[in-house]
Curated annotation (Swiss-Prot):
Changing R195A: Complete loss of nucleocapsid assembly. This is Nucleoprotein. The lineage of its organism: Viruses, Riboviria, Orthornavirae, Negarnaviricota, Haploviricotina. The gene is N. A motif (Nuclear export signal) lies at residues 425-440. It comes from the Viruses. Homomultimer; forms the nucleocapsid. Binds to viral genomic RNA. N0 interacts (via Ncore) with the phosphoprotein (via N-terminus); this interaction allows P to chaperon N0 to avoid N polymerization and non-specific RNA binding before encapsidation. Interacts (via the Ntail) as N-RNA template with the phosphoprotein (via C-terminus XD); this interaction maintains the P/L complex anchored to the nucleocapsid template during the sequential transcription. The modification Phosphothreonine is found at T279. Residues 477-505 are annotated as: Interaction with the phosphoprotein. GO terms for cellular component: helical viral capsid; host cell cytoplasm; host cell nucleus; ribonucleoprotein complex; viral nucleocapsid. Residues 1-375 are annotated as: RNA packaging and organization of the helical nucleocapsid. It comes from Measles virus (strain Edmonston-Moraten vaccine) (MeV).
Length: 525
């Protein structure tokens, strides 16, 4: 049996191991297409700001082809370094594209104000054609609709500080698009707006240079469909991270945005490790989890072997990303999601609509957290030097905290949320109608009187005796009440206290002419 277990461990390890690179075969190269990337041909700030202005207009032109759009974006992304050409040549290793660099200098004879650097050859017409200045219609389209503030006619500046602020503002909006351009483009607008507000408050960007939604949609779609552009962006991030010492301000901002980009598309794998394994609940000892635990161990080893590109495997369309999906460990993933929902409020909005989602193990994770509340790990306590008396104190405090949390969370759930307007009185609110409405009013009144006379324990019995027979029971609440009557009783007592307080406040406020009405609709708009 020991030999079988060793063979099984070796089999699992080799099964998930990536292919070993061999020198016997040649490198496979695809059919390349050429991408022209304009870069500044001198160190003048005027040249760089004018080039940035023309490239932003070019991207806003709806008639621009895909490769030309990619070249313009690469040119903007590399403008913050001293030598953009050297940077592009150093980090670019793409089997699908061939990058051609074109140096751009100032020119007074071209409509765009720029020309391609050449030895004695007049390239003004070619530069105007590239920057779409040969067609007045396309020029008008690119002239308007790129910045939200229509009063900004151009972004040409003379001083380096102003140029860095404008360039940093534009780059921040482009880099933020990479976070969800591949994984969740439909829901990306909200998160992108939150990042923009954050950097505006930190004075890293200038609010006046917020780009229009159409311009951002064009860039997001291009990032999603062009793997070569994403490869360049990931290579640029890794190159910035390897740079020792102090980095430029724009480079530090890119590293900050990288915290939202890294591990995109790997939420199932990361959250399973966080909530399923790191919490170290005893449920991990179940036989059902044995095989999936070994699978996760192999995947963690594979993740480390992939090196610095592992967090970007989904963005880079690495085929090995399928091994890390939750379908490879469905039971452990379902259990981890149950643990996460109980521990963190942010997990409540996660989408669990997967075909391999197992509700039984999801419930197992929830119950594991609830019943383990207040318990102190003996191993961790010994490592931290926590005495037995301190452990008992911590358990007691944690139990009271958990009980308060459960009493606030458990209770009847609203089937529909209605908003109260200032022009609505209490008599105009929607009613149940008929006999059922009178029964509910009677039960509430008797419950308040019972609470005042006999206290919370007998009031809860009166509440239970007068529940409407036609009221549907919530399945989750009914299950939890049957499993833990104490929690159900505590929840009912809490509700009766609230109803009694509401009754007292109504009696106190009956003498006033105008009731106080709170309208929360504006908070949700």
């Amino acid at each position: 049996m020991a030999t079988l277990l060793r063979s099984l461990a070796l089999f699992k390890r080799n099964k998930d191991k990536p292919p070993i690179t061999s020198g016997s075969g040649g490198a496979i190269r695809g059919i390349k297409h050429i991408i022209i990337v304009p870069i500044p041909g001198d160190s003048s700030i005027t040249t760089r700001s004018r080039l940035l202005d023309r490239l932003v207009r070019l991207i806003g032109n709806p008639d621009v082809s895909g490769p030309k759009l990619t070249g313009a974006l690469i040119g903007i992304l590399s403008l913050f370094v001293e030598s953009p050409g050297q940077l592009i040549q150093r980090i670019t290793d793409d089997p699908d594209v061939s990058i051609r660099l074109l140096e751009v200098v100032q020119s007074d004879q071209s409509q765009s104000g720029l020309t391609f650097a050449s030895r004695g050859t007049n390239m003004e017409d070619e530069a105007d054609q590239y920057f779409s200045h040969d067609d007045p219609i396309s020029s008008d389209q690119s002239r308007f609709g790129w910045f939200g503030n229509k009063e900004i006619s151009d972004i040409e500046v003379q001083d380096p500080e102003g140029f860095n602020m404008i360039l940093g503002t534009i780059l921040a909006q482009i880099w933020v698009l990479l976070a969800k351009a591949v994984t969740a483009p439909d829901t990306a607008a909200d998160s992108e707006l939150r990042r923009w507000i954050k950097y505006t408050q930190q004075r890293r960007v200038v609010g006046e240079f917020r780009l229009e939604r159409k311009w951002l949609d064009v860039v997001r779609n291009r990032i999603a469909e062009d793997l070569s552009l994403r490869r360049f962006m990931v290579a640029l991030i890794l190159d910035i991270k390897r740079t020792p010492g102090n980095k430029p301000r724009i480079a530090e901002m890119i590293c900050d945005i990288d915290t939202y980009i890294v591990e995109a598309g790997l939420a199932s794998f990361i959250l399973t490790i966080k909530f399923g394994i790191e919490t170290m609940y005893p449920a991990l000892g179940l036989h059902e989890f044995a095989g999936e635990l070994s699978t996760l161990e192999s995947l963690m080893n594979l993740y480390q072997q992939m090196g610095e590109t592992a967090p970007y495997m989904v963005i880079l369309e690495n085929s090995i990303q399928n091994k890390f999906s939750a379908g490879s460990y469905p039971l452990l993933w379902s259990y981890a999601m149950g643990v996460g929902v109980e521990l963190e409020n942010s997990m409540g909005g996660l989408n669990f609509g997967r075909s391999y989602f197992d509700p039984a193990y999801f419930r197992l994770g929830q119950e594991m957290v609830r019943r383990s509340a207040g318990k102190v790990s003996s191993t961790l306590a010994s490592e931290l030097g926590i005495t037995a008396e301190d452990a008992r104190l911590v358990s007691e405090i944690a139990m009271h905290t958990t009980e308060d949390k459960i009493s606030r969370a458990v209770g009847p759930r609203q089937a529909q949320v209605s908003f109260l307007h200032g022009d609505q009185s209490e008599n105009e609110l929607p009613r149940l109608g008929g006999k059922e409405d009178r029964r509910v009013k009677q039960s509430r009144g008797e419950a308040r009187e019972s609470y005042r006379e006999t206290g919370p324990s007998r009031a809860s019995d009166a509440r239970a005796a007068h529940l409407p027979t036609g009221t549907p029971l919530d399945i989750d609440t009914a299950t939890e009440s049957s499993q833990d009557p104490q929690d159900s009783r505590r929840s009912a007592d809490a509700l009766l206290r609230l109803q009694a307080m509401a009754g007292i406040s109504e009696e106190q406020g009956s003498d006033t002419d105008t009731p106080i009405v709170y309208n929360d609709r504006n908070l949700l708009d």
